Regions:
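N-terminal Sec/SRP start-transfer signal
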Residues: 1-33, 47-48
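Internal alpha-helical transmembrane segments of multipass membrane proteins
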Residues: 23, 325-346, 384, 393, ...
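Peri-transmembrane interface segments
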Residues: 38, 42, 248, 282-341, ...
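Basic-flanked hydrophobic alpha-helices used for secretion and membrane insertion
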Residues: 160, 164, 168-305
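Transmembrane alpha-helical interface segments in multi-pass membrane proteins
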Residues: 348-350, 355-402
Length: 465
C-alpha cells in the first residue's frame, strides 16, 4: 500500500479535526488571494491614472527634474518638433506609441484684478486633442471611463483652474462653484500694492494681446518670468474650476493650452516645451520602448537629453506600490503563521493518538523514513486541499459578489470614488503561488511531529496506552 494512500486514509480517519484544519487553511488562503487580488487591481488603477496624467515616458533636458521648475525657459526643449517626428516615424516605435505630445510646465502669479486678488500658480500647458487622447488611455483593459478635459483646440485662450485657486481669486460666483469658501473682506495693504503693480502689466497685456475675451468671460491674468528674465503676462479665460485631490495642488492648479503657456514663457511666436510625453499602447512593453527611445534621442541630441519613466516623473507611484505590497506581505506572513500552527497541532494530535499504531508499523518492518514521510504527506494533503478550497472561494466571492456589488472608495489624491475590484481571475500566478506556498508550509509544519513519530522506539510505542 502506497505511503500517499495511507496518508489520505489517515486524514479521513478523524474527519472533524481534518475539516476544522482544512477550513482554517481555506480561510487563510482566501484572505491572501483576495487581498492580493485587491492590491493587484489597485496598482493597475494607480498605473492607469498616473499614465493618463504624465504618460509612460518623458524626454527632457538633462537635469530638468531637479532644476527645471526654477527656470523652465533655460531647461526647455526649444526644437522639439523634429525629435517628435523622428519618434513617431521610427519603425520600431511606431507600433508601440499611442500619443507623442509636448508639455510645458510654468509657475508664476495669477491675478483677477477686478477683485484685487492674486496668488501663485503652477500650470501645465498641453495640446488639447493630444491631452484628450491621453486621458482616455485604458491600456490595462480596466474599463475605466475617460477623464474629462476642458481644453479645446478651437478655444486657444481657454483654461481651467483649481477650486482652491478660484477661492483665492474670489471667483466663487463668477465660476458658480458650489460650497465655495468666501475670502475675507479686508485686503492687506502690501497685497494691494502688489496688485497695483500687476494691474499695470495686465493693462499692457490687454493692449498687446490678441482678440478681447467675450463679454462676461472670467479672465485671469498669468504672470511668469520669461526666457529673458523679464516678466511676461498673458490673459486666460477660465471656463471652470476643477477640484483637485490634494489641497496644496488645488490652490495652485492651472491647466491651459500649450500655445498660451509658450506665449507666457517665451513670448509671441516662440516655441518650447518642458518635455516630450510618450504614451504607449501597452505598459508591458515599457522597457523595450524606453531602450529604443533612448537610442533615437541619443542619435538626435547626444547626452543633452534624457528619458524618464512615469515612476521617475511621479515618485509617489512607487511609494504607494511599496506600501500596498508591504501590507500584502505582512498579511501573508500572518496567514502563513496561522497555517503553520494549525497543521502542526493537527499532526501532533495524530501522532499522540496513533503511537501504538506507529509501534506496530515499525514492528512489521516499516522504516523510519516512511513513517516520517506518511505524516508529512498528511499535513501536505490537508494544506493542499485547504488552499485549493480557499482559492476557489476567493474566485467565487470576488467574481460573483464583490466586483458586482458597487462598492467604492475615494483614494488619497482623488476627488471621485473608485470602484472596489478584486483581480483574482487575472492573477493566476497569485492563486498558484498561494496553493504551493500553503502546501509547503503545511509540509514544513508537519515535519517536526513526523520526526518525533519516526524516532519512537518500537517497544515504547507498543507499550503506549
Amino acid at each position: 500500500m502506497s505511503t500517499l494512500f495511507l496518508a489520505w486514509r489517515n486524514v479521513l480517519r478523524n474527519r472533524r479535526r481534518s475539516a476544522i484544519t482544512l477550513a482554517t487553511i481555506a480561510v487563510a488562503a482566501m484572505a491572501v488571494v483576495m487581498l492580493g487580488g485587491y492590491v493587484a487591481a489597485t496598482i493597475k488603477g494607480l498605473e492607469t491614472l498616473t499614465v493618463r496624467q504624465v504618460g509612460h515616458l518623458q524626454v527632457m533636458s538633462r537635469g530638468y527634474l531637479e532644476f527645471g521648475r526654477a527656470n523652465p525657459a533655460r531647461h526647455a526643449l526649444r526644437d522639439y518638433a523634429p525629435l517628435a517626428g523622428r519618434l513617431r516615424a521610427d519603425p520600431q516605435l511606431a507600433p508601440l506609441l499611442h500619443v507623442v505630445t509636448p508639455t510645458l510646465q510654468v509657475q508664476g502669479v495669477a491675478g483677477h484684478f477686478a477683485s484685487a486678488s492674486s496668488s501663485t500658480f503652477s500650470a501645465a500647458g498641453w495640446v488639447a486633442d493630444d491631452r484628450a487622447r491621453m486621458l482616455a488611455w485604458d491600456g490595462l483593459r480596466l474599463g475605466t471611463p475617460p477623464l474629462p478635459t476642458a481644453l479645446r483646440a478651437d478655444r486657444p485662450d481657454d483654461g481651467v483652474i483649481g477650486v482652491g485657486l478660484a477661492q483665492l481669486l474670489d471667483l466663487c460666483d463668477a465660476l458658480a462653484i458650489a460650497d465655495c469658501v468666501r475670502a475675507p473682506a479686508a485686503v492687506p495693504a502690501a497685497a494691494a500694492a502688489i496688485d497695483a503693480d500687476l494691474a499695470a502689466l495686465s493693462r499692457q497685456a490687454r493692449e498687446a494681446g490678441p482678440a478681447a475675451p467675450a463679454a462676461g468671460a472670467v479672465v485671469v491674468d498669468l504672470l511668469a518670468a520669461g526666457a529673458s528674465g523679464a516678466p511676461n503676462i498673458v490673459r486666460m479665460t477660465a471656463t471652470r474650476a476643477e477640484r483637485q485631490g490634494v489641497r496644496e495642488l488645488d490652490m495652485v492648479h492651472v491647466g491651459l493650452p500649450l500655445a498660451l503657456a509658450q506665449r507666457l514663457v517665451f513670448g509671441t511666436g516662440a516655441a518650447g516645451a518642458s518635455a516630450l510625453v510618450l504614451q504607449l499602447e501597452d505598459s508591458a512593453r515599457l522597457d523595450e520602448a524606453r531602450a529604443r527611445v533612448a537610442a533615437v534621442v541619443h542619435d538626435y541630441a547626444g547626452d543633452t537629453l534624457e528619458v524618464r519613466t512615469f515612476a521617475e516623473v511621479s515618485p509617489s507611484y512607487n511609494q504607494v506600490v511599496r506600501m500596498f505590497r508591504t501590507l500584502f506581505g505582512f498579511v501573508s506572513l500572518l496567514m502563513a503563521v496561522v497555517t503553520l500552527f494549525a497543521v502542526a497541532n493537527t499532526v501532533n494530535m495524530a501522532v499522540s493518538e496513533r503511537t501504538g499504531e506507529i509501534g506496530s508499523l515499525r514492528a512489521i518492518g516499516l522504516p523510519r523514513a516512511r513513517i516520517r514521510r506518511m505524516f508529512v504527506l498528511e499535513g501536505g494533503l490537508v494544506g493542499a486541499f485547504g488552499a485549493v478550497l480557499g482559492v476557489a472561494l476567493a474566485v467565487v466571492l470576488a467574481g460573483g459578489l464583490i466586483n458586482h456589488a458597487g462598492f467604492s472608495w475615494t483614494p488619497p489624491g482623488n476627488i471621485t470614488p473608485v470602484p472596489i475590484t478584486i483581480d483574482v481571475q487575472g492573477s493566476a500566478r497569485l492563486c498558484l503561488g498561494t496553493v504551493l506556498a500553503m502546501t509547503l508550509i503545511a509540509c514544513i509544519s508537519s515535519w517536526w511531529p513526523a520526526r518525533r513519530a519516526a524516532r519512537l522506539e518500537i517497544v515504547e510505542a507498543l507499550r503506549h496506552a
